Swiss-Prot record:
The gene is dcap-1. Residues 141-173 have a biased composition (Low complexity). This is mRNA-decapping enzyme 1. One of its GO terms (molecular function) is mRNA binding. GO terms for cellular component: P granule; P-body. It is found in: Cytoplasm; Cytoplasmic granule. Belongs to the DCP1 family. It comes from Caenorhabditis elegans.
Length: 332
């Protein structure tokens, strides 16, 4: 393989892993994948197979934490992806285009692949991983008190196979999540305390005002000089700070937004994108159109929280007070 092909393959693998981590954040390495697979469930009462609504790109991958191996189908039909962690108790059977897998007789399921060779290849890999788990003393110790292996059972083969679509169905784009900034502030703040804050807990500017001797009012010029000395550089907007924070990135990383698998051109099915979802363009800070109105108690609680924790907020309010006081003194 030429260097250019190796580089392209590495870039594609990295892109696929990044998309896979949007479903399972602990995914660390893709062991194999197929462009299409479908899930069948057995109806124990009727003793027949039923095709589920789950089909799409199939991945076998390694995880950074227990369970160490899993396989999944990035469902193209609805947002619910199929994820099956592998354990040493898994029983696997290969029959033509199907792979039967179960941990007990009540949970028998089947994977269907377009090609028998693909089914054989995936079966060999899954069986190898199960054997590796069985050979691990750590996994054996964890499963020592678990139920013994499920007994061998004859599994009825599905009577029909899913028709392979000629073209992957077009799915409507999902709307990005809406951000309620006021709700974010409200949920982040601590419950208001009934007792008044001590002077030591107040912002520096309020401490100075509270410690002034009665009757010795500060002049407007003195207040303005102290304000300039204590002023801090203006920070970015709260919304921008949250968007760039590690909390926003980690939340987006665990998104269950599905991948859309496709038979044929796999590369075109997995779109390259950022982990962080963009903000809705219709959300305008301060517009009042997308945010609920706070009642009196909520507004007082929010203002009290900001007065106690945000020195810059107090400074801005005080600046407005100084400006108003200067205007009043000039008029009078």
């Amino acid at each position: 393989m030429s260097d250019a092909k190796k580089k392209a393959a590495a870039e594609l693998a990295a892109k696929n892993l990044a998309q896979l981590q949007k479903i399972d954040i602990a995914a660390s390495k893709i062991l194999d994948k197929m462009p299409f697979a479908a899930i069948y469930h057995i109806d124990a009462a009727r003793k027949e197979w039923n095709q589920s609504n789950c089909e799409g790109t199939f991945f076998v991958y390694q995880r950074a934490d227990r369970p160490y191996f899993s396989f999944l189908i990035a469902n193209r039909n609805d947002p619910s992806d199929f994820i099956e962690p592998l354990t040493l108790n898994h029983i696997l059977r290969h029959d033509g285009n199907f792979i039967y897998f179960y941990k007990d007789l009540a949970s028998i399921q089947a994977l269907w692949f377009h090609q028998i060779d693909d089914a054989q290849k995936i079966y060999n890999l899954l069986q190898k991983l199960v054997n590796r788990l069985k050979g691990s003393t750590t996994e054996q110790a964890r499963a020592a008190k678990a139920a013994s292996e499920a007994p061998q059972a004859s599994v009825p083969a599905p009577t029909q196979a899913p028709a392979a679509p000629a073209q992957a169905p077009q799915m409507a784009p999902q709307a990005p999540p809406k951000v309620d900034l006021l709700q974010l502030i409200k949920s982040a703040q601590n419950p208001p305390q009934k007792s008044a804050a001590t002077i030591e807990q107040m912002p520096p500017m309020l401490q100075k005002l509270m410690l002034k001797e009665p009757g010795a009012a500060m002049s407007a010029d003195e207040l303005e000089k102290d304000l300039i000395k204590s002023a801090k550089p203006h920070r970015n907007h709260l919304l921008q700070e949250f968007t760039n924070s590690t909390s926003a990135i980690s939340l987006a990383a665990v998104s269950t937004k599905p991948l859309h698998g496709s038979e044929g051109d796999v590369e075109s099915d997995i779109a390259e994108g950022e982990i962080l979802e963009p903000l809705d363009a219709s959300f305008v800070v301060g517009s009042g159109e997308q945010t609920p109105v706070l009642n009196k108690e909520q507004f007082i609680s929010a203002i009290a929280h900001l007065m106690q924790t945000d020195d810059e907020f107090v400074s801005q309010i005080h600046q407005a007070y100084v400006s108003a006081l200067n205007r009043r003194l000039n008029i009078d």
